[in-house]
Regions:
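Positively charged n-region of N-terminal signal peptides that target proteins for export
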Residues: 1-5, 141
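Sec/Tat signal peptide C-region and signal peptidase I cleavage site
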Residues: 16-20
Length: 317
């Protein structure tokens, strides 16, 4: 595979979506963080180079950093009792290539069903399922490209819908200076079957990011720019900042701040006239990375009364 051809394909695919994309999208569970490490760094990170299979959900190019024959399990508690769970398995293929398969499940729980008059007629449930295959390829000693193809189904009561999406990722990593730079186009695609006659758009997200370890010390900073095809809100709200404190090769602490989440979750304080985010947008996490076993956990604040916990565990056979 030629590096220039892959990069051109990535940029052309992203630009085609820009023309028709708006803010009304479906399958928004695909926006949620799967990786606890990424969740701890503000919910969006596409540049951290680690032996962490869950990061592949954020950038398929990062699959090349994952050990052969790795099984990864993830779980997240979300707002209003919703939960997500998933699993992935990755292995090294032919020269410079790595493969992976994954599945994600989101359960929104049971909800009250009413008729047009508002009378309760029973209960219904809602859930989303996604299955995917990922391929990454080392284009050179520093460039890696990756692609994820995904089939998605969604259920609300007796109704269902289906969609296909593709993630494209490109990563540049300079190990001598510990620079990592990535460009990712997430959720390119469309709906195959709708709930009704009106089809919804996929939650496309064009992202760019950088990570840098400072002076070979314990600190690594990350900055990710998201939703780069929509500029109808403040530029700073496109940014997600993260900090890793690498205590040893096996242990890290992480913290992040999501500017958009903090702004959107602001509420009026009863004490004064100022709005308060009540720590919305703040996230924290930690990880244990042994040779064969990995464990990651993250806490993220979404609202004064809502937070999420994300767990990842992985084992290399």
């Amino acid at each position: 595979m030629n590096k220039k051809v892959f990069l051109l394909f990535l940029l052309l695919s992203a630009s085609l979506v820009v023309c028709g994309q708006d803010s009304q999208t479906g399958y928004n569970f695909l926006r949620l963080p799967v990786s606890a490490h990424a969740a701890a760094l503000g919910g969006e990170n596409i540049t951290v180079i680690e032996d962490d299979a869950s990061l592949v959900f954020h950038n398929p190019a990062l699959l090349s950093s994952v050990s052969d024959k790795t099984l990864c399990l993830d779980f997240m508690t979300y707002m209003e009792g919703a939960v997500t769970a998933g699993a992935s398995y990755s292995w090294i293929g032919f020269d410079r290539a790595t493969w992976g398969v994954s599945a994600q499940y989101m359960d929104y729980g049971s909800m009250t069903e009413t008729d047009a008059a508002g009378d309760i007629t029973g209960e219904f449930s809602a859930r989303d399922i996604a299955v995917a295959g990922t391929f990454s390829y080392e284009l050179s000693s520093r460039f890696v490209g990756g692609i994820t193809a995904r089939f998605v189904t969604s259920y609300i009561g007796d109704y269902s819908s289906m969609a296909m999406s593709v993630d494209l990722g490109l990563n540049y990593f300079d190990p001598d200076h510990d620079w990592s730079v990535s460009l990712v186009a997430r959720n390119l695609g469309g709906e195959l079957k709708s709930y009704e006659d009106e089809y919804v758009k996929m939650p496309f997200n064009l992202q760019a990011g950088v990570s840098k370890r400072l002076m070979n010390g314990p600190l690594r900073v990350s900055l990710t720019a998201t939703d780069l095809t929509h500029w109808d809100y403040d530029a700073v709200q496109h940014l997600v900042a993260g900090l890793d404190i690498i205590l040893s090769p096996q242990i890290y602490l992480a913290a992040g701040y999501n500017f958009r989440r903090a702004e959107e979750m602001k509420i009026q304080s009863s004490d004064d006239d100022d709005d308060s985010s009540h720590w919305a947008g703040v996230s924290l996490g930690a990880g244990l990375q042994l040779e064969r076993f990995k464990l990651h956990v993250a806490y993220a604040r979404y609202h004064v009364s809502s937070y999420s916990l994300v767990f990842n565990t992985a084992y290399c056979f």
